Regions:
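ATP-dependent carboxylate/acyl-activation modules
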Residues: 3-268
């Protein structure tokens, strides 16, 4: 079949680090969606057979109604950010931009800090966490309207609480790995292909008289992991492993900076 031939060709191209003159991609139909980005648009969800880290198609839906086109985009955006972190982290997303990202010593702490980062925007959002959701966390999640919760696991008591909301989509994620497929973006008349942006600098050079301490260095790395997933122009204000303000998608940096600093307020 064409998909089988494409898989073989792509395997050898990757093995030999070749850039193919012709690129054949094979996807299988996962779902026919109710509609696309707008109600008048037809839409479908196709997936590749791969072991991509935190890939949505490898997650198990435990509860809730089917995903929409926009839900899938938001969930994927949340998982892209979550895959950056090894430590316990919670990511909250609205309209494909993070509204709160935070680390913590527990899932409850990480979720609480992500919520506190922007308690307004998280309403109706998507939450992803790389740990087990317990009863205490579930009760806090249940207190607001969320579209989707994605986590690596759930306590039985947590599921009892969360499933009381009929329409809440609950997903159990596959284990994290370091597999990252190339990113493909459609453009008019073609596609763009690039390697996944999963690298941070090996070392940093302080160019100011005041040198950063270890805590500040960790915040720099935390901020870099988040900001690359924010729509440009992107500004992120962070402290102690928590976003305090996020300015996204403005046509100039000054506008994004004003939004981020205004959101962070006195904490900036």
């Amino acid at each position: 079949t064409a998909s089988y031939d494409a898989a073989i060709a792509n395997y050898f191209n990757k093995k030999d680090n070749l850039v193919p003159e012709k690129l054949t991609l094979s996807y299988k139909l996962q779902d026919s969606l109710r509609y696309g980005e707008n109600p008048h648009q037809k839409a479908y969800h196709y997936v590749q057979d791969n072991n991509e880290s935190y890939a949505l198609q490898n997650a198990v839906q435990l509860h809730g109604k089917e995903m929409s086109y926009n839900n899938i985009q938001d969930a994927s955006a949340a998982l892209d950010i979550l895959s950056e972190f090894e430590e316990i982290t919670c990511v909250a997303v609205k309209h494909m931009n993070p509204c709160g990202v935070a680390t913590g010593n527990s899932v409850f702490e990480a979720y609480s800090r992500a919520y506190e980062a922007d308690p307004v925007s998280i309403f109706g959002g998507i939450v992803a966490v790389n740990g087990k959701v317990d009863k205490e966390t579930a009760e806090k999640m249940h207190s607001i309207f969320l579209e989707i919760i994605l986590a690596t696991d759930y306590d039985e008591e947590a599921l009892d609480i969360l499933t009381k909301k009929k329409n809440l989509r609950i997903y159990k994620l596959s284990e994290k790995n370091n597999n990252h497929e190339q990113q493909i973006k459609s453009v008019r008349g073609g596609i763009l292909v690039q390697d996944f942006n999963d690298k941070l600098a090996d070392e940093y050079e302080s160019v100011t008289e005041k040198k950063v301490d270890e805590t500040q260095q960790k915040d720099v790395e935390f901020g870099l992991k988040v900001v690359k997933h924010v729509k440009s122009n992107a500004i992120v204000v962070v402290k102690d492993g928590q976003t305090l303000g996020i300015g996204a998608g403005q046509m100039n940096r000054v506008g994004s900076c004003k939004i981020a600093l205004e959101q962070a307020g006195a904490l900036a």
